[in-house]
Amino acid sequence: MNKKRNAVEWAMHYRQIIILVVCCLVAFGIYSLPNMRKNEFPDFTIRQGIVVAVAPGNTAEEMVEQVAKPLENYIFSYKEVKKDKTFSMSRDGIVYIQVQLNDELNNKDEFWSKFKHGVSTFKAQLPKNVLAVQVMDDFGDTSALLITMESVDKTYRELDDYMDALQDRLRRINSIGRMTVSGMQKEQISIYLDTHKLSQYGLTEQTLAVTLFTKGFTTSGGRVKNPVYVQPVYVAKSLNTVRDVQEQIVYTDPIGNNIRLKDVARVVKEYPAPDSYITNNGKKCLLLSIEMKKGKNIVQMGEEINRTIAEFQPSLPSDVNLFCITDQSQVVGDSVDNFLHELLVAIIAVIIVVMLLLPMRVALVAASTIPITIFISLGLFHAFDIELNTVTLAALIVTLGMIVDNSIVIIDSYLEKLGEGVSRWHASIQSATHFFKSIFSATCAISITFFPFLITTTGQIQDFLVSFPWAISIVLGVSLLVAALLVPFMQFYFIRKPMESATNKNGKKKFSFLDALQKYYNKLLDLCFTWPRMTMALGLLSIIIGIVLMGKLPQRLMPIAERNQFAVEISLPTGTAVEKTGQIADSLEHILRNDPRVVSVASFVGCASPRFQTAYAPQIAGTNFAQFIVNTVSNQATEDLLNEYAPKYTDYFPEALVRFKQLSYNEATYPVEVRLSGENIDTLRREAEKVTALLRSMPELVLVSTNFNDPLATTRVVLKEDEATRLGISNVMLETTLAMRYGSGIPVATVWEGDYDISVKLKNSQADSANSCDLEDELIPVAGGLANVPLRQVADVVPAWENGQIVRRNGIYTITVMADLQRGENGMDVTGKVQKAVANLSFSPDVTLTYGCLLYTSPS
């Protein structure tokens, strides 16, 4: 009766099947490498959203009391909301609430759908002047590419037409998800009213607004219906051009004399002064943000987009250029190329190292298992829909050294048995069979080591690591099977002789590094067994020294992103006009662009860029904020520029804080954040001043500030009730009049030119260049516009200071004292110093101290 063969013996007998299967799997792995899913990071569930509520005319305090608090109470009624990380920022007329969801919530789309429906219903309970409440649940979506379309001479409208044509072409690429365009400035028809002429004819702004609104409003004209046919009725629009607006009759006297709009106002078609704009290398531009569909190959998508852009560029005028600011597909492609380079280096290193100890044939057999295992693993990744990203690439790199160990152990045993006189066939089978249990146990032990990560981590870190244990297990499992089933035949076929000690002409053994190593290793073993207590003591001492050294090493959970780009954030006092912000941004941009190491500078003035890197969240901007995305010639150039420019230009501009930010994978906004919470804002301010002074005295810190921002200079108009009532002036009439004359304009109609809408706005010529004296002397119409009185006659006009921003975290007022680090400082080390220093301060008993820096945003 034939003896039953084990797996190794079966593989030797049916080697043709094993070789065929291995070749097919390797070929599939080679095919999978360019075609499998690739991305920079694993798919994160960004459990964040933004709720924005707008209520013009409210101060920051009024926004807190009337809007933020009711919204917070409603938001906290959802059990899915993580309250301690949900916070609101109330500003002049607007409130932003960043909602953080619980880490265990995976189906965020279901929650946001339910939440949006609830918020739309809840809006009715807010004050009537709350114009809109919007929920943005795409806050965490990351742009795969940011592409600018720039020109010096073309108008925004022309650029928009070219951008539409580009989007039409890009939509043909199946892997592209959402595309959004930023930076568009639309034309408007501005009606600059002459208040003196209005008074002369007894007209008011409100009268004109109502007249123009009725001319521009479109509704159904009904239908002509009979038993045979139904004809819709369309009333032609009266406002179709600038001339139509100019020629509108706004007043007719009893004898038929007409007053047209052009008689009392200057009507022009123009680009209004923007509150925000985007430029690239000093040229006006539109920014196209491209996102990838989930589960697609970002490298292939990038190649298709670049091909499409190359084909589209010749169709554009010569002064219109396309430029790619950020390209995640290039980052991922470079990561794959770097891995292949590391793979080649590993194979060569194994061959060289093994050659020092063993013959060439042995080295080649051992080294050949590396590419075989890697490509089979890549094929399995593709088959199991595991994408190639930073985490899975890390798993492949970590296991490079482990892959070859299994093969070397079996080959070494094979050589030993050959030296004992065992036949090649039986030596090959016995070597693999003898060590299979040991190798299998080691593989299981190493694989199981990483699975507790899936239990101990939550939220974003778990999303980041979820594929790591599986990738490790697949690679090591493939390595085990290759060593047990393929290596036995490879060593049988290629290694035909045992290792023999070489001799010289005198018959003496030649020097062998392996023999020398074995000789001294045996001596060391003898010493260890002779002095067992000393051996144990040295082992214990080495563990203690290792623990001490580990505690002294600088720690950082999430690393710096090695990129050829960095960000710059410019912040000015609250209320700063976008023109002044633009001047400082333009000056710094010129400084950067004059450096040959800088390739491009994309400038966002009054706004923030889309999320172009997973951990770099978009900023909540205003007219006092600007941001750069700076591209450099290399990763090293980025380091050099930051080391040179950050210390020099952080405080270079008066009133401006300039933050040079190197991209990293940590989600903390600032590396050092000290939070003071309580119910009294004045108390919090006093305590925050202590912390601010302390942090500014520490040389490791720069850009120390608070999130309450600087006070906002305002003008408060208080009606003299008796005089105003006698003259028929109400709050609504006064607010409407001042809004028309000192605001960005009141929209009264829309003119359509095809698919291009042009807003018609009533405004005052001094709206963008006025001061407090002009406001006091402003003539307010009374008696239906037949007379005017200066504002100071019916109201007190007084300057006032208001809070620039009020922040509440978990429904409690919270001032955060923030600070950035000097270049080269370690965030966790500095945080420890800050904690020790702050511990020596005395705070009011009703103030709670917490931290929100790198140490506390990094999961343990």
Task: Report residues per predicted region.
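Signature of alpha-helical transmembrane segments and their immediate interfacial
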Residues: M1-K38, F435, S447, F489, ...
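Helix/segment boundary signal
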Residues: N2-H13, V21-K38, S113-M149, K186-D275, ...
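Solvent-exposed, membrane-proximal periplasmic/extracellular interface segments of envelope transport
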Residues: R5-V8, M12, E62-D138, H196-F217, ...
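Transmembrane helices with small-residue packing motifs
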Residues: Q16-I17, C23-N58, E62, N106, ...
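Hydrophobic transmembrane alpha-helices and their membrane-interface caps
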Residues: G29-S32, I348, I352-L356, M360-L415, ...
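Helix-loop junctions and hydrophobic alpha-helical segments within the transmembrane domains
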Residues: I325, V336, I411, K417-S441
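Transmembrane alpha-helices and their membrane-interface boundaries in multi-pass membrane transporters
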Residues: L400-Y414, F436-T456, D463-N506, F628
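Conserved small/polar residues in nucleotide/adenosyl-binding loops
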Residues: Y856-S860
